[in-house]
Amino acid sequence: MCIRDSRDYLKEKGHDVTDHGAHEYDALDDYPDFIFPCAHAVASDTDSKGIILGGSGQGEAMAANRVKGVRAAVFYNGPDEIIKLSREHNDANILSLGARFMTEEEIYDILEMWLDEPFGGGRHQRRIEKLDH
């Protein structure tokens, strides 16, 4: 799956999209160079969400989570409940996808599910506030 495909898909669904790259494959690229601009943009706008794609999504999420205010969740396959709970309970504001382990159709389904799931608040808000201290 190409990042451009997911960007175009999200635009077609009515989402505002800012693409922080990479725009073409370069084996010499380092993912933090693309993840940090996304993470900083999300951290500075509490209404925004970020979608990052990598082979496994693990390193990308680790990089994003270095930015204060970011709560990046990793998903590369499994029960749909995992993706819903990342929003409902953890208010994940970045979704890091392991594109190597998912089909294009699965990625589209997960993007919709994740973006549509609201944060539950309540006791979960208290826990999230503790993450930033």
Predicted regions and their residues:
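Short, small-residue-biased leader/transition segments that mark boundaries at the very start
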Residues: 1-3
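Hydrophobic alpha-helical packing residues
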Residues: 6, 10-14, 64
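Generic secondary-structure signature for well-ordered alpha-helical cores
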Residues: 11-16, 40-44, 88, 112-124, ...
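A short beta-strand-loop structural module common to alpha/beta enzyme folds
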Residues: 16-28
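Short, well-ordered secondary-structure micro-motifs
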Residues: 29-32, 62-65, 85, 107
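Short, glycine-/small-residue-rich phosphate/pyrophosphate-handling segment
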Residues: 78-126
